[in-house]
């Protein structure tokens, strides 16, 4: 973490620029393996399943069998394990910034858009996997 660029978590601070959450030094990714559903809101395609390989406040790395277009907007729904069951979180919107093929699958880097709320499950996933 840089000394001259401290973490700014709240948008009501004077130094908040809008992209602070997405800067890699402010939002390190945490390795995880979490099931998700992905909806690209295409009328021809149903939502599909994937896995998140790492996550941070700024975005995540998504592993899926479906090809996603770069710059596409996705609605990602995380599933948190509670005992034996999985709990569905509120979907969050993200923009695909990079896609590459890995065998017959695809790995996409996604930047989250908008405010992150507790209902999205992101903070809980970070807390569970950073121990």
Language-model segment annotations:
Residues 1-55, 127-131:
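N-terminal helix initiation/capping motif
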Residues 30, 44, 70-72, 88, ...:
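Residue-level preference for beta-strand/loop junctions
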Residues 30-36, 68-81:
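Short coil-to-beta transition motif at edge beta-strands of beta-rich domains
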Residues 41-43, 57-58, 99-104:
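Short, conserved beta-turn/loop elements at beta-strand boundaries and strand-helix junctions
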Residues 48-52, 90-99:
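Short beta-strand-centered aromatic/proline hotspots
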Residues 117-126:
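A short macromolecule-binding patch
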């Amino acid at each position: 973490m840089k000394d001259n660029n401290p973490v700014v978590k709240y948008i009501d601070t004077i130094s908040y620029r809008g992209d602070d959450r997405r800067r890699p030094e402010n939002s390190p990714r945490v390795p995880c393996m979490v099931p998700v559903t992905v909806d690209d809101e295409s009328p021809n395609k149903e939502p599909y399943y994937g896995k998140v390989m790492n996550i941070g406040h700024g975005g995540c790395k998504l592993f899926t069998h479906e090809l996603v277009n770069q710059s596409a907007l996705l609605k990602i729904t995380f599933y948190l394990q509670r005992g034996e069951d999985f709990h569905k979180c509120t979907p969050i919107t993200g923009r695909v910034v990079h896609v590459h093929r890995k065998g017959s699958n695809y790995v996409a880097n996604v930047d989250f858009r908008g405010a992150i709320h507790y209902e999205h499950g992101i903070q809980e996933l970070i807390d569970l996997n950073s121990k």
